[in-house]
């Protein structure tokens, strides 16, 4: 009986120790979403001081700056926005291919990614005293550095050009705009 008790104890310990090393999906996801540094190089982005002539970006806003930790938070929110946009695009693509089987497509042209773009960040304090930022993405700088001092505005071009607004207080994004295709 003593051997049986030791055997049961060993079996229980091995079961408990195996179970203790498992991570559930939420734990894995939180580890993957942990970002401790902003990884863009200075040649890929610029933080621009808001100019009241850019009234179409924000109304009644005041210029402000961005901290390293805010850039990291923005990156997390951007990843969420990209994932949600691309899921919506996939749903639309499936619906299109089902409705028009003779015109199958593999992408909508509005799928997005974060890598491979230049970025312009325009941070402001809005009327409510909340920090917001408009981020402009573009895959072609046309061989100049003008984009570091002037807002890059391009018509058409599809998912090569898009922009988004993020409210850092509420941690929400809005007004995701993706250029159309001519």
PLM features per residue range, with description:
Residues 1-31:
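Bacterial Sec-dependent N-terminal signal peptides
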Residues 4, 12, 32-35, 104-109, ...:
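Proteins with a high burden of low-complexity, intrinsically disordered sequence enriched in S/T/G/P/A and R
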Residues 31-146:
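Surface-exposed acidic loop/strand-edge motifs in secreted or periplasmic proteins
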Residues 128-182:
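Extracytoplasmic electrostatic interaction patches
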């Amino acid at each position: 009986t003593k051997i049986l008790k030791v055997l049961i104890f060993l079996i229980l310990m091995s079961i408990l120790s195996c179970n203790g090393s498992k991570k559930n999906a939420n734990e894995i996801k939180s580890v993957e979403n942990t970002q401790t540094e902003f990884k863009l190089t200075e040649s890929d982005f610029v933080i621009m001081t808001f100019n009241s002539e850019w009234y179409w970006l924000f109304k009644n806003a005041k210029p402000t700056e961005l901290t390293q930790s805010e850039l990291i938070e923005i990156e997390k929110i951007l990843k969420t926005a990209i994932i949600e946009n691309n899921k919506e695009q996939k749903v639309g693509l499936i619906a299109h291919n089902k409705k028009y089987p003779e015109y199958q497509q593999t992408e909508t042209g509005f799928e997005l990614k974060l890598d491979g773009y230049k970025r312009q960040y325009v941070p402001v304090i809005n009327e409510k005293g909340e920090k917001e930022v408009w981020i402009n993405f573009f895959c072609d700088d046309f061989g100049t550095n003008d984009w570091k001092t002037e807002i890059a505005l391009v018509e058409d071009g599809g998912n090569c050009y898009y922009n988004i607004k993020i409210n850092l207080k509420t941690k929400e994004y809005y007004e995701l705009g993706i250029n159309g295709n001519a």
